[in-house]
């Protein structure tokens, strides 16, 4: 649902890679990112920086290029993927399935774009 709500604000493309070992998945992610050389890469990671929704909206608004978000598989992410990131972002100190992380990411993307466009979805 949030993906549909995002459509007025941003083009959204979901690329899923098959579950694999951390090393193989890392190589596949890096290969996929090769075609996105100019994009800002935001990797979701427990070790990442936490933001309030308003701070995240401001960060999102500061990028002047395409943004690629990376969510790891069930065994985490290869160090090389984290090193490729322009930003390591933590949704929470909790661990989520990648499906739930995607839903939370979509909701926060919608919330952030709504904040940036002066919408009424977010109540401070």
Residue ranges and their predicted role:
Residues 79-123:
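Structured adenosyl-cofactor binding patch, chiefly the S-adenosyl-L-methionine
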Residues 72:
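Rossmann-fold NAD(P)-binding glycine/threonine-rich loop
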Residues 48, 75-76:
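Conserved nucleotide-binding/hydrolysis micro-motifs of P-loop NTPases
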Residues 10-68:
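S-adenosyl-L-methionine/SAH cofactor-binding core of RNA-modifying enzymes
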Residues 1-6:
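Long, amphipathic alpha-helical "stalk/connector" segments that mediate intersubunit docking
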């Amino acid at each position: 649902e949030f993906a549909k709500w995002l459509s007025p604000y941003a083009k959204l493309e979901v690329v899923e890679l098959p579950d694999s070992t951390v090393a193989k998945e890392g190589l596949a992610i890096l290969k996929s990112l090769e075609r996105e050389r100019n994009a800002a890469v935001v990797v979701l990671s427990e070790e990442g920086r936490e933001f309030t929704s308003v701070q995240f909206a401001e960060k999102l608004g500061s990028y002047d290029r395409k943004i690629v978000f990376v969510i790891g598989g069930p065994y985490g992410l290869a160090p090389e993927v984290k090193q490729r990131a322009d930003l390591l972002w933590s949704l929470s100190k909790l661990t989520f399935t990648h499906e739930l992380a995607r839903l939370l990411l979509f909701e926060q993307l919608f919330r952030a774009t709504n904040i940036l466009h002066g919408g009424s979805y977010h109540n401070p």
